[in-house]
UniProtKB/Swiss-Prot annotation:
The active site is at C2, K585. Residues 2-219 form the Glutamine amidotransferase type-2 domain. This is Glutamine--fructose-6-phosphate aminotransferase [isomerizing]. It comes from Methanothermobacter thermautotrophicus (strain ATCC 29096 / DSM 1053 / JCM 10044 / NBRC 100330 / Delta H) (Methanobacterium thermoautotrophicum). It holds the Pfam family SIS. It catalyses: D-fructose 6-phosphate + L-glutamine = D-glucosamine 6-phosphate + L-glutamate.
Length: 590
């Protein structure tokens, strides 16, 4: 996820304002920063690195002009380098663009432009935009028409801001499936990816909708892509700056849970990449997942998928244990290493050990990380930066990649079901108020248990991990059938047991386990289909989910209420769920 800012001031220098605005987007995560101003010549300063580091080297505020654009980049296409940092320009340097999103057909557009003589300087998808605008302006269009024509040629998501020295004093912005707001000041205007960037300058904003453009030139005009004027309402924001960074949510974790439907949609755009990687890998006889923590739980789901749908024997090994139990890897084994950061020390060491013995694939979120450079094959989750320490949206994005991998390797029917997952998630999020009320009644317990069978077992493990990470309550996840082999001794009056039981072949046996714990005084919190009257009857509390979610895709949807439950229990206990004690986002030591 990137952040873009633009401003057109009535007086004063734009560069210091842009620098201050992009600093307020640091929370989104980034690896590069850049600013372009127009006076009317376009001048650019940009580099990879933290804002303070780049500013110390380049003095980003020292650029002339009362208008400009700025960007903080989270790499998706091309490594974090000065060349790949935004803004990007056309051949002549007369047009500059900043962009948030992913252009899916950029390679074919780039090839077409190169055949016409355009020269590219970066590896990014974004650079096709200024070159397309240049092409259409050379044909006689103005900046507004050229930008609209360029965007109609592109597939994917975008929020952009464009300037041209051929039309000084004008900024054009547009959006599709990526947020862009307009800030309305006193005789001056702003564009931004998010409210916090501009709150120091105005609290009056216009929210652009998909397929809309805005033209700033001393005045403000919003149009559709055909140039028809669109009337927009100006909203007043009463958030504090801190709340605005979190999009109005109290914590990043809650914001990121609510971003999960869009995170899955973004991950699904990688389907062509998955198909390409599967073709490169070729035939495999065995799968071996290697991961830690939440990524390990995603791997367990992968084991159930590969074995039940494709019949491929699959192992799941903790990265920290890999050196002791790697087994017989060979050139017909696909070893899959999962890491949000791509820098997890245990996972990297396991990857290095496996590279000479098996086919290796890294599933990561951070472009250019060590895992992406060292694995033979790479797939990206495209979840964007995740600020909360406890993994939420990156978990469902990892799962989505695994499901796509299984689909590409022989179960294509999965894709139709995956396409509906964001819709199911959105319905699950609608029940947050009920989950918040539930959390208030069980925030003072000392133990919590999560049980499930089959595909629900990894969900039980992940639910327990989330709870103990951010609430500091002892939580354990168990295969429901294992209760009688020891854990049942820990069940006592009032102990919460979360029973995860989606529709499917494991449902009836899980219900028997629910009866076991009820007989020993447990407080049962049932999580199942909203139409599951048998589970509802046995449970003290019940969380109902869409009845079309079966056991196979349940890990993607049933985790949502468990994340919400953990979050609200943490808040009830007066804790900060974004920063749990003793934990770090990226574990770079063994």
């Amino acid at each position: 996820m990137c952040g873009i800012v633009a401003c057109i001031l009535k007086d004063g220098s734009a560069a210091p304002v842009l620098l201050e605005c992009v600093r307020r987007l640091e929370y989104r995560g980034y690896d590069s920063v850049g600013i372009a101003t127009s006076d009317p010549m376009i001048r650019i300063k940009k580099d990879s690195g933290k804002i303070d580091e780049v500013d110390a080297e380049l003095d980003l505020a020292d650029l002339p002009g009362t208008m400009g654009i700025a960007h903080v980049r989270w790499a998706t296409h091309g490594l974090p380098t000065a060349e790949n940092a935004h803004p990007h320009t056309d051949c002549s340097g007369e047009i500059a663009v900043v962009h948030n999103g992913i252009i899916e057909n950029y390679l074919e557009v780039k090839e077409e432009l190169e055949s016409e003589g355009h020269i590219f300087r970066s590896e990014t998808d974004t650079e096709v935009i200024p070159h397309l605008i240049e092409k259409y302006m050379d044909e006689g269009m103005d900046l507004e028409a050229a930008t609209a024509t360029a965007l109609r040629k592109l597939r994917g998501a975008y929020a952009i801001a464009a300037v041209s020295s051929r039309e000084p004093g004008r900024i054009v912005g547009a959006r599709k499936e990526s947020p862009l707001i307009v800030g309305v000041g006193e005789g001056e205007y702003f564009l931004a990816s998010d409210v916090p960037a501009i709150l120091n300058h105005t609290s009056r904003v216009i929210y652009l909708d998909d397929g809309e453009m805005v033209i700033l030139d001393g005045d403000l005009r919003v149009t559709d892509m055909e140039g028809n004027t669109v009337e927009k309402e100006v909203h007043s924001i009463d958030w504090s700056a801190d709340m605005a960074e979190k999009g109005g949510y109290d914590h990043f974790m809650l914001k990121e849970i609510h971003e999960e439907p869009s995170a899955v949609r973004d991950t699904l755009t990688e389907w062509d990449e998955v198909l390409g990687v599967v073709e490169e890998i070729g035939e495999v006889e065995r799968i071996c997942f290697v991961a830690c923590g939440t990524s390990y739980h995603a791997s367990l789901v992968g084991k159930y998928l590969f074995e039940s749908l494709l019949g491929i024997p699959t192992d799941v090994i903790l990265a920290s244990e890999f050196r002791y139990s790697a087994g017989a890897l060979n050139d017909r084994t696909l070893a899959i290493f999962i890491s949000q950061s791509g820098e997890t020390a245990d996972t990297l060491n396991a990857l290095r050990a496996a590279n000479s013995r098996a086919k290796t694939l890294a599933i990561v979120n951070v472009l250019g990380s060590s895992a992406t450079r060292e694995a033979q094959h790479v797939l990206y989750t495209r979840a964007g930066p995740e600020i909360g320490v406890a993994a939420t949206k990156t978990y469902v994005s990892q799962l989505t990649v695994i499901y796509m991998l299984v689909a590409a390797m022989g179960a294509p029917e999965l894709m139709d079901r995956l396409e509906r997952v964001p819709e199911f998630m959105e319905r699950a999020l609608e029940d947050e108020d009920g989950i918040k009320e539930l959390a208030a009644t069980c925030s003072d317990v000392s133990d919590f248990f999560f049980i499930g069978r089959g595909f629900a077992y990894p969900t039980a493990l992940e639910g327990a991990l989330k709870l103990k990470e951010i609430t500091y309550i002892h939580g354990e996840g168990y295969a429901a059938g294992e209760l009688k082999h020891g854990p049942l001794a820990l069940i006592d009056n009032g102990v919460p047991v979360v029973a995860i039981s989606p529709p499917g072949p494991c449902h009836d046996k899980t219900l028997s386990n629910v009866e076991e714990v009820r007989a020993r005084g447990a407080r049962v919190i049932g999580v199942g289909s909203i139409s599951d009257e048998s589970l509802r009857k046995e449970a003290d509390d019940f969380i109902g989910l869409d009845p079309e979610v079966d056991d196979v895709i349940s890990p993607l949807v049933y985790i949502v209420p468990l994340q919400l439950l953990s979050y609200h229990v943490s808040v009830e206990r007066g804790l900060d769920p974004d920063k749990p004690k003793n934990l770090a986002k990226c574990v770079t030591v063994e």
